[in-house]
Amino acid sequence: MARTVHCIKLGVDAEGLDFPPYPGELGKRIFEGVSKQAWADWLKHQTMLVNENRLNLADARARQYLARQMENHFFGGGADAAAGYVPPTA
């Protein structure tokens, strides 16, 4: 049976994650209060940040930047927008 959480990002009760997606206290907070849909939305945004900012994930500073952005996305004022990203027009 799926876990249900009150998603702090979407503001609704939704299916929770199956396991903490990140190590440490931040991962625990995300596991306890973020839905699968909100996590999927973050992964899309994270991909845009990596691509648009040309981040090298082998660089510890890039990983620290993404961790800060993840925390801001879920628990702060929001993550940075991907610089230079233009959404596709339908």
UniProtKB/Swiss-Prot annotation:
UniProt keyword list = Iron
Listed Pfam families: Iron_traffic
Where would one find the signal peptide in this protein?
none
Record GO terms (molecular function):
iron ion binding
One GO biological-process annotation of the entry reads: cellular response to oxidative stress
Q: Does the keyword Transferase apply?
A: no
Task: Respond yes or no to whether keyword Mitochondrion is given for this record.
Answer: no
Q: Which InterPro entries match?
A: Fe_traffick_prot_YggX (IPR007457), Fe_traffick_prot_YggX_sf (IPR036766)
Q: One GO term of the cellular component aspect? A: cytosol
Lineage, top-rank taxon, reads Bacteria
SUPFAM superfamilies noted in UniProt: YggX-like
Task: Tell me the function of this protein.
Answer: Could be a mediator in iron transactions between iron acquisition and iron-requiring processes, such as synthesis and/or repair of Fe-S clusters in biosynthetic enzymes.
Could you tell me which HAMAP family the record lists for this protein?
Fe_traffic_YggX (MF_00686)
**Stated family:** Belongs to the Fe(2+)-trafficking protein family.
Q: What is this protein called?
A: Probable Fe(2+)-trafficking protein
The species this protein belongs to is Delftia acidovorans (strain DSM 14801 / SPH-1)
